[in-house]
Amino acid sequence: MTKSNFVDYAKIHIRSGKGGKGSIHFRHEKYIPWGGSDGGNGGKGGDIILRGSRNYWTLLHLKHKYHIFADHGKAGEGKLRHGKDGQNKTIELPIGTAVFDGTTGKFITDIKYDKQEIVLLKGGRGGRGNNYFKSAVNQTPKHSQPGEPYEERQIVFQLKLLADVGLVGFPNTGKSTLLSIVSAAKPKIADYAFTTLEPNLGVVNVHNSYTFVMADIPGIVEGANEGKGLGLRFLRHIERNSLLLFMIPSDANDIANEYKILLNELACYNSELLNKQRILAISKSDMLDTKLEDVIKKELPTDIPHIFISSFTQKGITVLKDLLWEKLRFHDMKEIS
């Protein structure tokens, strides 16, 4: 996904359809000069429906849609003819989309699975025609009902990528390179900060038997929770990852402190992120010998599993994939139990 086609935010004015007006009509048939009422009911207004779809990975298809309106119900007619119902409007959304009220910011719902359907706005009911009000004492009522009004509101859609593993680290720590090595993804890679401007997804194959999805999130900087660097926009994608793989290069000045800064940024954004499983990968470690590794190990945080890796030589890559898979399996077993 590139900057031009990765869209994870959309704000749209939506409106259901109003109900059609009931008809006021009387029979005018030959030889029946005093025919009774035969006004039909109005049609129902169309609903606004949200539907989960695996056919979409981003909100790109909504990028230039500012208004989505369902059709109004048609008015009833004589001879008991019912007005045509307004057509529903269905908005297809990728799995992992959160829905908020665009005015208040209040959370409404989210899309969790394929083909999930949620009626967000209901269309108005059609009004009753005058035939509905006919009685034994009044065969020719001269009134009907208007249709019910439509509903409308501003809605914000925010996509949170669904990935098993999220890569967390400062810019230029080798996250994109790792993703390109363990999957078929082709993220942009260069020797400067903020090469990754949009999230990238890749499917990781483990021993040709199992797969999981890995997400390369743009690099975090100190103060990201306050909007620095690429800011908060991409931190929300970490919320739906089952496991966080922290990546810090072996030549960092203080690995433990960098890890602490990353944790603090996540905690300031959403403290629940600290409840996720974590693994620390020391990247760019192909130039380290055993003695240097032992020195670095003594400086590492003790509350997180760690592994030394190199995407260049593929040192530790197979072991890393196995470790990630085992952690994900353990997470799934806990979810089931």
From Swiss-Prot:
Q: In the UniProt record, does the keyword Cytoplasm occur?
A: yes
Query: Which residues take part in binding Mg(2+)?
Result: S176, T196
Q: What cofactors are annotated for this protein? A: Mg(2+)
Keyword annotations from UniProtKB, A to Z: Cytoplasm, GTP-binding, Hydrolase, Magnesium, Metal-binding, Nucleotide-binding
**Could you state one GO biological process linked to this protein?**
ribosome biogenesis
| Record localization | Cytoplasm
Which InterPro entries does the record cross-reference, listed alphabetically? Answer: G_OBG, GTP-bd, GTP-bd_Obg/CgtA, GTP1-OBG_CS, GTP1_OBG_dom, GTP1_OBG_dom_sf, OBG_GTPase, P-loop_NTPase
Specify one Pfam family.
MMR_HSR1
Listed under GO cellular component are: cytoplasm
In Swiss-Prot or TrEMBL terms, this protein is called: GTPase Obg
| Species the sequence originates in | Azobacteroides pseudotrichonymphae genomovar. CFP2
Give the lineage.
Bacteria, Pseudomonadati, Bacteroidota, Bacteroidia, Bacteroidales
